[in-house]
Regions:
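Conserved pre-motif I regulatory segment
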Residues: 7-46
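Subunit-assembly interface segments of extracellular/virion macromolecular structures
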Residues: 45, 62, 66-78, 82, ...
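Conserved Walker A/P-loop ATP-binding site and its immediately adjacent core
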Residues: 56, 69-94, 287
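Conserved RecA-like ASCE ATPase "motif II neighborhood" in helicase/translocase motors
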Residues: 101-149, 157-177
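Conserved P-loop NTPase catalytic core
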Residues: 116, 144-150, 154, 162-272, ...
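Short helix/loop capping segments that flank catalytic or ligand/cofactor-binding pockets
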Residues: 54, 83-84, 128-130, 157-158, ...
Length: 297
């Protein structure tokens, strides 16, 4: 298991190494059970929000490369920064692979499949169509099995026009990419799987199997933040604070927001004293984007 062992050695986290080893084995066993190399199969890879799903995806890719799979697509949402971030992380994690970005079509055609190849693409109609044509036309792809890992698989991938008897652009292109290979395993990766589970059997998007990623030690998720009794770190503000902001000019900062910013600055100072640098503060005031402009810095 050269590829998986090399990937694990770069994680520098014993509990994550154990988790990735176990999860990738479970995914491998499910593929062996549900995939017959004649018809495509769909798997749901379900993990908690911000619980290390990317690390698990890369571990699964490494394990499948060890048994001879050669072509992997890793799909991100249609966001330039996210695609680049995923590409750079994959490149630094899978050093034994040929990791390609969206514009590396010439490199792909020149280098072929001497190494296992991961292509990191945005879910963008133009980009997906371009790579579908490349996969269809290249000689060394013929007869190869394709593995697709769709990060946030419930975002943009499904057919949003099904009730109008039409095909949405992204969904149509993804179907075409799946059909370009002799057969395909498609992994829908998400923390919010409801829409995927509700897909019809005939759609081709209903999962044949499900794998759940357990979060590692120290993970703080819904069980912590929505616990009863309320955890110490949760503070409730007045329910009408947003009304106060929208009624005043852009310089008005309500009491709850002021306190939140002060807590954040204290935490930043604490982390700096410990030699840590990464601090983020997020405000989600409304589902309406025009309200967000009042909070933008």
């Amino acid at each position: 298991s050269m590829y998986l062992d090399n990937y694990l050695s770069r994680l520098n986290n014993e509990s994550l190494e154990t988790s990735v080893t176990e999860v990738s084995k479970q995914i491998f066993d499910n593929v062996k059970k549900f995939y017959n190399f004649k018809e495509s199969a769909t798997g749901l890879l379900f993990g908690n929000v911000q619980s290390g799903k990317t690390a698990q995806m890369l571990g699964a890719i490494a394990r499948f490369a060890d048994v001879g799979y050669k072509i992997f697509l890793l799909l991100t949402s249609d966001n330039v920064d996210l695609q680049r971030q995923t590409y750079l992380r994959t490149q630094s994690s899978l050093l034994d692979f040929n990791v390609l970005s969206e514009k590396d079509d010439i490199k792909f055609l020149q280098e072929g499949l001497r190494k296992p190849t991961v292509i990191v693409l945005k879910k963008n109609g133009r980009i997906l169509k371009k790579w579908r044509e490349i996969l269809l036309s290249c000689q060394f792809c013929k007869g190869q099995f394709l593995m697709i890992f769709d990060d946030e698989g419930d975002n943009a991938s499904l057919n949003t026009l099904v009730n109008k008897n039409r095909h949405s652009t992204i969904n149509k292109n993804l179907d075409a990419i799946k059909d370009s290979a002799s057969s395909c395993v498609y992994f829908e990766v998400t923390a919010t799987p409801q829409s995927l589970i509700l897909q019809s059997e005939v759609s081709g998007w209903h999962p044949n199997f499900v794998n759940y990623f357990k979060p590692g030690k120290g993970y703080l998720g819904g069980d912590f933040f929505y616990a009863d009794p309320k955890p110490f770190c949760i503070k409730y503000t007045k329910e009408n604070e947003l009304d106060d902001v929208t009624a005043e000019d852009d310089n008005y900062c309500p009491e709850g927001l002021q306190e939140s910013i002060l807590y954040f600055l204290i935490e930043c100072a604490h982390k700096k004293l410990k030699g840590e640098t990464n601090c983020n503060f997020m405000i989600h005031p409304s589902i309406k984007t025009e309200i967000h402009s009042k909070f933008a810095i």
